[in-house]
């Protein structure tokens, strides 16, 4: 929580500094390296709310591989060249569990169907949110290897860096991690463990300057960085500026909802799967104060990565709504 507060304040200072100097932030941290940024999206149901929640019994892209494949094609039509899915849920607070054969088969089938649908037009990113033991993660990775995912994300709990490193050494799929980590020191441990794709969330990792250091550190290990985004348009813009200035950038997560759009009166430009470099000073965005005031903070809604309180046994076949 403290790093989240610090990161937000630090990002605000960079926005102020850029506007004072009439320069986009990326010019203040090394200059522009990329002309545009490749982006990816999660597979969200067609009939979903702003948080990605399933509504009105729409297609369940999280557990139905056929629905996931169909939705992946929709995103390709939008211009995306990479899609992410996490079919290993539901999530439990306990973490580090052994997936059942049913869950292993469901995950493999989903990736298989997506690959059959998209062919070589899009990369598949496989998320797990740290839900597996080391052995279970390796078992799943072996089943996914034939479908050539771009990465296998956070296969073990984030505080088990050495365990994630063991998974990385046991599979041909690049292993990614870092959305819940802070500061360059923790990411250095990831790199030493053999994790080849770092995923700092700039709203948690320490802000713009600390995240820039994480990018630079990745170059020493011949690794790449794919910023994690789930904090809204300010974090999205801040991460984009660091990425535009960094050679080791791989791909940027993006979330496109009507609510996110309404939070801004000026936003960054997204064009057919790519984020274009802003030319306006600071972060290049302006907040819609009226919209923000009309949506005060509330702790009553669904949180990203909300865990169920029911421990899951090794033969779990239930969905989160059934627990």
Q: What spans do the regions from the language model cover?
A:
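Short, Asp-centered acidic motifs that coordinate Mg2+ and/or phosphate
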Residues: 82, 151, 197
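A cross-family glycoside hydrolase active-site/sugar-binding cleft signature
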Residues: 40-42, 84-86, 125-129, 153-155, ...
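Shared catalytic-loop signature of beta/alpha-barrel
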Residues: 142, 148, 156-282, 286
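Residue-level signal for alpha-helical context at structural boundaries
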Residues: 35, 47, 132, 155-158, ...
